[in-house]
Curated annotation (Swiss-Prot):
NCBIfam families: clpX (TIGR00382), PRK05342.1 (NF003745). Belongs to the ClpX chaperone family. GO terms for cellular component: HslUV protease complex. This is ATP-dependent Clp protease ATP-binding subunit ClpX. It comes from Prochlorococcus marinus (strain MIT 9301). HAMAP family: ClpX (MF_00175). Residues 52-75 are annotated as: Disordered. ATP binds at residues 146-153. One of its GO terms (biological process) is proteolysis involved in protein catabolic process. ATP-dependent specificity component of the Clp protease. It directs the protease to specific substrates. Can perform chaperone functions in the absence of ClpP. One of its GO terms (molecular function) is ATP-dependent protein folding chaperone. Keywords: ATP-binding, Chaperone, Metal-binding, Nucleotide-binding, Zinc.
Amino acid sequence: MAKFDAHLKCSFCGKSQDQVRKLIAGPGVYICDECIDLCNEILDEELLDNQANTNNSPQVKKKLPTDNPKKSVPLELTSIPKPLEIKSFLDNQVVGQESAKKILSVAVYNHYKRLAWKFKEENKNSNSKDSQATKLQKSNILLIGPTGSGKTLLAQTLAEFLDVPFAVADATTLTEAGYVGEDVENILLRLLQKSEMNVELAQKGIIYIDEIDKIARKSENPSITRDVSGEGVQQALLKMLEGTIANVPPQGGRKHPYHDCIQIDTSQILFICGGAFIGLEDIVQKRMGKHSIGFTTNSDQNKVDTKKIVDPRDALKNLELDDLVKYGLIPEFIGRIPVCAVLDRLTKETLESILTQPRDALVKQFKTLLSMDNVELSFEPDSVEAIANEAYKRKTGARALRSIIEELMLDIMYTLPSEENVKEFTITKKMVDNLFSSKIVKLPSGSKRVIKESA
């Protein structure tokens, strides 16, 4: 073995392991430390040349108009849509959730008023002593609601109405710096990409962080071991949510000390965090019912308290800061998201309305699809009700509606394009019932499950 090691040499420069400080082995090849240093120098020179060419290229300057901010971004107070206008637009896309829409409308209006105020202060006469006298703090938003209740849709509709860059990030992929996973700065990279790498435009955008409840601390008490995908991510997000100058790697991935980063001021970015927070109702109910436990509790008071906490939807209306802390969010993180909106669980009636009323309702989408084949599609009112009932049973909110209609329309969309004589088609309640009743298999009346005991 020693004889074999003596013949090891670098596959690039040919020097033996005795002539270099370090020889790194790969699958059938070797490279020395001198060749690695040379490769690093070549890459650094190439990176600098590319950046110089990018800065001098007229095409890039035309593509990234950083000197001309997007006109649709409201910088004047008169151009900012009022809360009633924002809610009216949300009503066209989102059914129900009146309280959440009102909270979002006011929060977004105040956020862009703050942007207009800062823009006005920056353009004041420098001789004015009152310039920058009052600093308006940012108010990020937390959306709490069950899956399929419209959290992401609300944020997307807001961005569409305001015509600003909007990015969606998944909190489950984030980890603390130094561990396998995505850095929190990659969230800002998505916003930059949406704004065509225009930093000025990205700094006025909206970021929606989904599944924020998945980064909750695993236990209420701080753990000895590091929680790199839970509390560690919350700690990493603190400065970004509050407002800081963040360094974003333009190519994504981890930050590298030898690579230049794009600096973004996050103080102007509106962060909307959303999550289902499964089990939060139990925490609220437990807190509300604490005082009714014991021998000295009045029996009449017990009855009233029990009625108050029976329905989980009513429990979340009494949400407090301590409940989120017990769930696993650290107080510093909650303090940087002062606006909280609780979304209601969708009822059968709401699901029916979602199918037909919004601008992009599913019924309208499938009517448009079949109209391309010169077929007029219609739904009987009873069939819409049957679809909503089936979606309600699945307990996945509005997301269940699309999967049900896709199942229902599969055979229809498969055969209708080939039927030249068919010009109209109607979905009936019987078709919906037959589709899902056939999936229920009943056991024979006399059958019993036999469990064999092991010897």
